[in-house]
Every structure is written in C-alpha cells, then in structure tokens.
C-alpha cells in the first residue's frame, strides 16, 4: 500500500516520492519471484470529506456573488475554486438557494469524484498502476452476516484480549506490541478513529489472503 492520499486535494511532491518508492519496491520484489499486489487506500470517510464539500459550497456561493466566509477547518486551495467553477458550468446557480445540508452533501460527492479522477490521471501518467483502489467507506458496509470489516476486526481483537474500555472509549493494547502508548479505537461519543479504520483495513487484507503487508506512509504516521 502506498500513496493513499486523501481525495481532498491534488497529489503533492511527497506523494510522488512514495509512488516512486512503492512502485520500485513492487517491481524489484516481483522480479525476485514474489506475487505482489499494489493497493491505494482511499481515505474517503470522516469529517475531512464533509469539510471538503463545505469548502466547495462556500467557493460556489462566492463565485456567484454571495458574501460567505470560508470556515477555518475548510480547504482554501485554488483547486477548490476550480471544482466550484466546474459545478457552475454544469448547473449554474441551481444550488445557490438549496438546502445547505443537501448542497454540501452533493458538492462533497461531486468534489470527491473530481479529485479521485485527478489522482487516477496523475498516477497513470506517472506510470504507477494499482490492482485496487480501496475505499475506506467499504470497511463500514455489512456483509451477508450483518458484520462490517470494522465489526469483524473488533471481534477478533476482543477474543484475543487486545481491547478494553476506559472512560467510555474503546482502546487497543498496542503498548503490548512495543508501541509508545495504547490507541483509541472508538471515542467515548461513539465516533470511530482513523486508527480503527486502519486496523479494519489491515484485517481485511489478511482476510483476503495476503501474508506479508508492506506500508509506505508519511511522517504523520510515525507513531504507528
């Protein structure tokens, strides 16, 4: 797994480094006789996606003459204006007086599709191809037994005694594996953490039969 950028903006130079390293590693291992599968993990769940949709909604209104301020948590890059302009070119002012929640959700999914297509285009131009673009959202979709990948991974960890509840939150005993601290899986308010998604994703990889997992991550994952 490598690159795995959020679909909330263009790929940057760091992603290019990870693409070069990941692709080269896969090619060398494949040449050495390994059966290698390359995957891009799409971080398409969580509040950053709502913030992205709201960012486009604000730029859309501004481009149509509304005096609307960009919230602090939103994305201010010029590419957001480009996406908003694309919506104007297609829909005009259709969304200007729409229900704010409906507008944000529509723009979120539209902006997501736009940026994901851009990421596909850039990686293909770079010469990097993936066997799978894996959606984080799919980890929360129940199977025929009514259990999602998140549910199954929690069950597996619980059976091995690796999780506990403290102050209303569910924790993973990662310190038992030489981590610097235990990690929260589910917050006290019931919200899943990014780490929970990461655990479920890796559990899903093992369910699919992979026996050796290689991750190329950014510095923000150093603690993992």
Regions found by a protein language model. Give the residues of each.
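NTP-dependent nucleotidyl-transfer catalytic core
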Residues: 1-224
């Amino acid at each position: 797994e490598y690159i795995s950028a959020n679909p909330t903006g263009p790929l940057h130079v760091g992603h290019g480094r990870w693409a070069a390293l990941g692709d080269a590693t896969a090619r060398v291992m494949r040449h050495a006789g390994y059966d290698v599968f390359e995957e891009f993990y799409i971080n398409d769940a969580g509040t950053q996606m709502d913030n992205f949709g709201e960012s486009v909604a604000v730029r859309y209104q501004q481009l149509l003459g509304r005096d609307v301020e960009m919230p602090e948590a939103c994305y201010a890059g010029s590419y957001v204006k480009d996406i908003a302009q694309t919506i104007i070119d297609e829909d005009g002012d259709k969304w200007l007086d729409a229900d704010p929640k409906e507008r944000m959700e529509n723009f979120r999914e539209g902006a997501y599709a736009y940026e994901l297509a851009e990421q596909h285009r850039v990686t293909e131009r770079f010469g990097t191809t993936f066997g799978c673009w894996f959606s984080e959202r799919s980890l929360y979709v129940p199977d025929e037994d009514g259990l999602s990948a998140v549910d199954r991974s929690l069950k597996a960890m619980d059976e091995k005694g690796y999780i506990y509840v403290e102050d209303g939150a569910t924790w993973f005993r990662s310190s038992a594996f030489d981590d610097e601290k235990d990690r929260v899986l589910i917050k006290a308010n019931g919200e899943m953490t990014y780490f929970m998604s990461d655990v479920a994703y890796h559990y899903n990889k093992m369910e699919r039969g992979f026996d050796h997992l290689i991750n190329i991550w950014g510095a923000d994952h150093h603690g993992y």
